[in-house]
């Protein structure tokens, strides 16, 4: 990639393809300023809020849909329909409804996360092994205990996979929304660089975004592969079941 980049700098002017040394210089200026941490934190807070609201709504709806068949038949097709609507449509509506700023970014991530997580969890529930539900009957678990001790631990692996998908798309959606709606956050800084025709700034902030993506994404993937949270959860819950019953 670097060799291709170097080659393209001989063909195109710096305003289109900036030189590597100018991008490195701009990147070092960002790293040495207080702007870096402040803007990264703003982007990460928006991403966390968007994921939180989307996942919370998904968990609530999943519990309701699995418990009430009529509501599932009425509203689940709507959830599937939401997945088809492109994020840019929601972004335009969010700007109209909420105005400019960080709120539209949070909204489109929440709406994009909601159908992905809900559909993944509902598909897993439909494929539940009946032996697990028989365990709930054996221990005479209540409905809430059945969710807590049986269904949630089983769904967690599906949740992890869906969460990785939501994260990988979410960080890009947040930056895109910031680019179009605000001058803060990583997307806002890219927008400022675009207005000032600082192509090296766009490249520099994009490099920072790539490192953030692989840093957080790699950590989440490691947690999923090792299964440390899942193992701890099963161990704790098995102890609680034995103590309770």
Say what each PLM segment does.
Residues 1-11:
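N-terminal signal-anchor transmembrane alpha helix
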Residues 11-52:
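Periplasmic/extracellular loop-to-transmembrane helix junction in inner-membrane transport proteins
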Residues 49-79:
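Transmembrane-helix boundary motif in ABC transporter permease subunits
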Residues 80-116, 124:
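Generic hydrophobic transmembrane alpha-helix motif, especially the helices
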Residues 107, 111, 143-176, 204, ...:
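Transmembrane alpha-helices
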Residues 125-128, 135-155, 195:
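Short helix-to-coil transition segments within interhelical loops
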Residues 187-224:
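Hydrophobic alpha-helical transmembrane segments of polytopic membrane proteins
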Residues 220-245:
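Transmembrane alpha-helical segments of polytopic membrane transport and secretion proteins
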